[in-house]
UniProtKB/Swiss-Prot annotation:
CDD domains per the UniProt record, alphabetical: cytochrome_b_C, Cytochrome_b_N
Gene that this sequence comes from: MT-CYB
Annotated positions binding heme b562: H83, H182
Lineage of the species this protein comes from: Eukaryota, Metazoa, Chordata, Craniata, Vertebrata
Coiled-coil ranges from the UniProt annotation: none
Protein name: Cytochrome b
Cofactor note text: Binds 2 heme groups non-covalently.
Cellular localization per UniProt: Mitochondrion inner membrane
Cross-referenced InterPro entries: Cyt_b/b6_C, Cyt_b/b6_C_sf, Cyt_b/b6_N, Cytb/b6-like_sf, Cytochrome_b, Cytochrome_b_C_euk/bac, Cytochrome_b_N_euk/bac, Di-haem_cyt_TM
Primary localization class, coarse: mitochondrion
Organism, as annotated: Microtus arvalis
Disulphide-bonded residues: none
Keywords: Electron transport, Heme, Iron, Membrane, Metal-binding, Mitochondrion, Mitochondrion inner membrane, Respiratory chain, Transmembrane, Transmembrane helix, Transport, Ubiquinone
Cofactor: heme
GO terms classed as biological process: mitochondrial electron transport, ubiquinol to cytochrome c
SUPFAM superfamilies associated with the record: a domain/subunit of cytochrome bc1 complex (Ubiquinol-cytochrome c reductase), Transmembrane di-heme cytochromes
Length: 380
């Protein structure tokens, strides 16, 4: 068996990735989220595949087909709610995974980090298009509002929007192409994940100290396979509690009303995992400025290696930057809350303040804190 594992052309790739992979001996549970994201992706692809067998991407029947899945298909309600809430679990793991990367300075592995940002954009695009498919009120108006943002692009904006819509409004052509893209993107994401892992295994994993751990490595199996399995059990338990007891808690009641182009919902808002970016978008009165801020709120992650001023990699031994980091986390929670509130006083000013704070902390305060900590170390 050992010979096959190490010599077979296909099996040895798996062996070098998940079995004999040298891993730091001190990585904590914050390193579990990579495998949990893999699990989420598998769950989403499988549940999505079964949903696609019964779903019809036509404006006349899309809403009814989702109702049919929930009422008439064996365990259709479970598959549908697992898929909807699986997206939420996916984003919870994603945000924690990115947050871990920022905290422990994993962005210094530039290829892995940049591929992660590409993955983040791909997952966000997939989730957005998936939200349109049930063809409820929030699906329709969410698609209208978000795609309309492209009209802010000078000169070609309006043409681009109509090209994406396949007409002069969000209609049958839009729904059909969104379904096609929503189906294909997870497989593209799977390929990107393999590239992400390829880059990671070129450098090896980071660890909580931020120091080089080449002198102290252990095999991935059995140590981290068992550790990851515990994470999997906890995630599945949380996931099934959410799906079976509170399936609609993260959804919008408006999406149980069929799409009606003649009736606008009182508050158009995306799913909870986009609210922080939506709040940044709304905080700028200018349309193009808002769109640029929205894109920059994610793209700014790519600049983190350039903004790293400290002599230390991780925040483990850097209390000043740690404080900045947790203020940033609190700020993102405020932005998420604001994104779900109506555009009126005092929410407008809170959103604008939180948006300014978001960019200021990353671009100004965290690099300055790093330099101050360098000076403190030099005093010793």
């Amino acid at each position: 068996m050992t010979v096959i594992r190490k010599k077979h052309p296909l099996i040895k790739i798996i062996n070098h990735s998940f079995i004999d992979l040298p891993a730091p001996s001190n990585i904590s549970s914050w390193w579990n989220f990579g495998s949990l994201l893999g699990l989420c992706l598998i769950v989403q692809i499988l549940t999505g595949l079964f949903l696609a067998m019964h779903y019809t991407s036509d404006t006349a029947t899309a809403f009814s087909s989702v109702a049919h899945i929930c009422r008439d298909v064996n365990y259709g309600w479970l598959i549908r709610y697992m898929h909807a809430n699986g997206a939420s679990m996916f984003f919870i793991c994603l945000f924690l995974h990115v947050g871990r990367g920022v905290y422990y300075g994993s962005y210094n592995m530039i290829e892995t980090w940049n591929m992660g940002i590409v993955l983040l954009f791909a997952v966000m695009a997939t989730a957005f298009m998936g939200y349109v498919l049930p063809w409820g009120q929030m699906s329709f108006w969410g698609a209208t509002v978000i795609t309309n943002l492209l009209s802010a692009i000078p000169y070609i904006g309006t043409t681009l929007v109509e090209w994406i819509w396949g007409g002069f409004s969000v209609d049958k052509a839009t729904l059909t192409r969104f379904f096609a893209f929503h189906f294909i993107l997870p497989f593209i994401i799977t390929a990107l994940v393999l590239v992400h892992l390829l880059f990671l295994h070129e450098t090896g994993s980071n660890n909580p100290t931020g120091l080089n751990s080449d002198a102290d490595k252990i095999p991935f199996h059995p140590y981290y396979t068992v550790k990851d399995f515990l994470g999997v059990l906890i995630l599945l338990m949380a996931f099934m509690i959410l799906t079976l007891f509170f399936p609609d808690i993260l959804g919008d009641p408006d999406n149980y009303t069929p799409a009606n182009p003649l009736n606008t919902p009182p508050h158009i808002k995306p799913e909870w995992y986009f609210l922080f970016a939506y709040a940044i978008l709304r905080s700028i009165p200018n349309k193009l400025g808002g769109v640029l801020a929205l894109i920059l709120s994610i793209v700014i992650l790519a600049f983190m290696p350039l903004l790293h001023t400290s002599k230390q990699r991780a925040l483990t031994f850097r209390p000043i930057t740690q404080t900045m980091y947790w203020i940033l986390v609190a700020d993102l929670l405020v932005l998420t809350w604001i994104g779900g509130q109506p555009v009126e006083y005092p929410f407008i000013i809170i959103g604008q303040t939180a948006s300014i704070a978001y960019f200021t902390i990353i671009v100004i305060f965290m690099p300055i804190a790093g330099m101050i900590e360098n000076d403190i170390m030099d005093l010793d």
